[in-house]
Amino acid sequence: MKGLALSSLRVGKKYRLINFGDTNEFVIERVLGSTDFAVKDLLTLERYRLKDLYKFGKGKDFEILEIS
């Protein structure tokens, strides 16, 4: 796993997650647990849980990056 660890994500910061070739950009709205967060997609403004993005597994390209 490259990039940031789930435990280092912070509320109000913007991130890019890459998994199985899909790219998602989101902002963390609140912490739900030690490794789960409520997030808002920056492109569609949809709200969902971060775990929903990798609930089917983490690919070889799994990476979380902070964006500005």
Enumerate the language-model features and the residues they cover.
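Mixed-charge, Lys/Arg-rich low-complexity intrinsically disordered regions
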Residues: 1-11
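Small side chains
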Residues: 3, 38-39, 57, 62
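Short, exposed beta-strand/loop patches in secreted or surface proteins that constitute
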Residues: 8, 28-30, 55, 65
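Basic/aromatic-rich interaction segments and small domains that mediate binding to polyanionic partners
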Residues: 20-50
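Intrinsically disordered, low-complexity, charged/polar segments
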Residues: 45-68
